[in-house]
A protein has these predicted regions:
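Catalytic-core segments of nucleotide cyclases and related cyclic-nucleotide turnover enzymes
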Residues: 349, 353, 367, 380-413
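Active-site-proximal structural segments of metal-dependent nucleotidyl cyclase/transferase enzymes
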Residues: 270-302, 318, 329
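A short pre-motif secondary-structure segment
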Residues: 327-330, 371
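Receiver (REC) domain active-site loop signature in two-component systems and cognate sites
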Residues: 55, 176
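Hydrophobic framework residues that shape the active-site pocket
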Residues: 291, 295, 314, 331, ...
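Active-site-proximal alpha-helical element of nucleotidyl cyclase-like catalytic domains
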Residues: 306-327, 335
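Conserved nucleotide-binding and Mg2+-coordinating catalytic segments in signaling enzymes
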Residues: 250-269, 290-304, 312
Length: 413
């Protein structure tokens, strides 16, 4: 990633140089005037440009038009700005403007670049039956580099959600034929939690209760049409920042800090509530309990850092092998569990034995060289008992695998 900074103040340039190096660590080119900036723009591709509005040889903001003409996102720095200039800049399509007041202003500019970097990977679905409104929202989002997908009504939006993965934000109008914004949100919330997707409602109606009704139905925020550019961007950024924070909290609570697979807490909270239904419907459900053979010897011989590398790689192989269809969790230490919903013990045994053989045949690469690692596994399937009892039976089978020589899969009888 390469950034262009156009600023005639050496003090401001030094501050930005320091902050960018500290926060972004990317390549930065500096220009003091319009002439030198044009030369740099002609010879490099830039991710974003941070430009002073008034330069010694271009007092009317010509640099902004030059940057935007080359389809480079532009963040404008200025010592002063009246309402007409502000409106003109926003209509040109800049990312944002920042008044040069103190160090916080420059920190904000650098944070904005980081947000743009993140936004490249954020998918946003816009549902609105008005082509004009939809295209306007799309243009605002694309100024901040979001990936934008359009739907012309609620039913089309549901079709998109069925086919597109990783949509993080839904922006939906209220009045739409077929399925309105409220109905769309209710259906979306049946499938996606607040940790998985954020929703912003839009409407031009004068009904003052709309904002509360949107939020009660499951939206994160509401915006009344017509809205100004800045309010829209602030609402979107705040909503996505909140989504990121909620996700981080959820991950801290439910993912293992080292291996990033699920933890014991998540495993029990997910499957304990399901167990009575699985028993009543006689749905097949099995668990495999895995233990890395002689893991203490790895730590004693090579040190705990190498031991951590082995745990991380072992967990990644489990995720690659099972994670698409089944749940992988770390129970603690070198012990992991795989939950096989829909599989009986015999089928789970077959898959786990294949994983065991693959692991034994493929050494784990560490910073201290390759290590031959094997695993012992115990399998048990649900027979009307509790989750604790099911795990205990898998643990007994795991003990049998160890006692029988390790690098084995044993199934609970």
């Amino acid at each position: 990633m390469r950034i262009l900074v156009v600023e005639d103040s050496k003090v401001v340039s030094r501050i930005l140089q320091h902050l960018i190096a500290q926060e972004l660590g990317c390549e930065v080119d500096f220009a003091e005037d319009f002439t030198s900036a044009k030369k740099l723009l002609a010879s490099h591709d830039y991710f974003v440009a941070i430009t002073d509005l008034n330069l010694p040889d271009a007092q009317e903001g010509e640099i902004v038009k030059q940057v935007l003409a080359q389809q480079i996102p532009c963040i404008v720095l200025t010592g002063s700005l009246d309402s007409k200039q502000r409106q003109r800049l926003l209509q040109l399509g800049i990312v944002d403007y920042i008044l040069k007041e103190n160090r916080f202003s420059y920190e904000y500019a650098v944070r904005l670049v980081k947000r743009l970097q993140r936004n490249k990977h954020v998918k946003v679905l816009v549902a609105d039956d008005s082509v004009v409104s939809r295209k306007f929202v799309r243009s605002l989002l694309e100024q901040h580099l979001y990936q934008v997908i359009e739907a012309d009504d609620g039913l089309s939006a549901l079709d998109v959600l069925n086919t597109q993965e990783d949509i993080q934000l839904l922006i939906t109008d209220y009045n739409m034929p077929g399925l309105d914004g409220f109905g769309l949100i209710l259906k979306v919330r049946e499938r996606f939690t607040r940790e998985e997707m954020a929703i912003i409602g839009l409407s031009s109606d004068d009904d003052q209760s709309l904002s509360a009704r949107f939020i009660k139905n499951g939206a994160n925020d509401f915006l009344k049409k017509p809205f100004v550019h800045e309010e829209f961007h602030c609402r979107v950024l705040n909503t996505l920042d909140s989504l990121d924070m909620v996700r981080r909290l959820w991950e801290q609570a439910n993912l293992d800090y080292l291996t990033e697979v699920y933890n014991r807490r998540y495993f029990f909270s997910r499957f304990e509530p399901q167990l009575s239904t699985l028993n009543q419907k006689q749905t097949a459900f099995s668990v495999g309990l895995l233990d890395i053979d002689f893991f203490k010897k790895v730590n004693d011989t090579y040190g705990h850092d190498i031991g951590d590398e082995v745990l991380i790689e072992f967990a990644q192989r489990l995720k690659q092998f099972f994670g698409q269809h089944f749940v992988v969790a770390r129970f603690g230490g070198e012990e992991f569990v795989v939950a096989f919903k829909g599989l009986n013990g015999s089928k789970a045994f077959t898959l786990l034995d294949k994983f065991r053989a693959n692991l034994a045949a493929s050494p784990i690469k560490t910073s201290d060289g390759e290590l031959n690692i094997t695993t012992s596994i115990g399998v048990a399937s649900l027979t009307g008992d509790s989750l604790d009892n099911l795990i205990q039976r898998a643990d007994k089978a795991l003990y049998d695998a160890k006692e029988s020589g390790r690098n084995l899969v044993c199934i609970d009888s």
